[in-house]
Amino acid sequence: MPTVKQLIRNARQPIRNARKSAALKGCPQRRGTCARVYTINPKKPNSALRKVARVRLTSGFEITAYIPGIGHNLQEHSVVLVRGGRVKDLPGVRYRIIRGTLDAVAVKNRQQGRSKYGAKKPKK
């Protein structure tokens, strides 16, 4: 327990909340370059091969980002736009790649939830 004199000399520091997406540096999205594109297995009750990419951001961070949707065209040196948003069954994956921008093409034949995958409205 500090004395009153110690508290006058050095006030208590407020506890700061940690940012959930520190690599974005307060921006809504960041551009980055894929360093590696690979698959990983999800946590226990789930089973799949989830597509992820190791991305070097313009903020200087290297992060693991999830590639949403069915099928993708990403490879090493692809330029992508990254947003925050974790994937619950992939530990350490706290970012997602935005489909339909830069080098990440939109998901084909997507009818519902198109805005999340960069898909255009289908012609009638």
Swiss-Prot record:
Q: Which GO terms describe its molecular function?
A: rRNA binding; structural constituent of ribosome
One GO CC annotation: chloroplast
Q: Does the keyword Iron-sulfur apply?
A: no
State where it is primarily located: plastid
Q: Where in the cell is it found?
A: Plastid, Chloroplast
Q: Which Gene3D superfamilies match?
A: Nucleic acid-binding proteins
**Keyword check for Chloroplast:** yes
Looking at the record's lineage, which domain of life comes first? Eukaryota
Could you tell me the keywords of this UniProt record? Answer: Chloroplast, Plastid, Ribonucleoprotein, Ribosomal protein, RNA-binding, rRNA-binding
Q: Which SUPFAM superfamilies did the record assign?
A: Nucleic acid-binding proteins (SSF50249)
Cite a single GO BP annotation. translation
Family under the similarity heading: Belongs to the universal ribosomal protein uS12 family.
The record's note on quaternary structure and interaction partners says: Part of the 30S ribosomal subunit.
Function of this protein? With S4 and S5 plays an important role in translational accuracy. Located at the interface of the 30S and 50S subunits.
Its protein name is Small ribosomal subunit protein uS12cz/uS12cy
Question: Species name for this entry?
Answer: Sorghum bicolor
Q: What is the lineage of its organism?
A: Eukaryota, Viridiplantae, Streptophyta, Embryophyta, Tracheophyta
Give the gene symbol. rps12-A
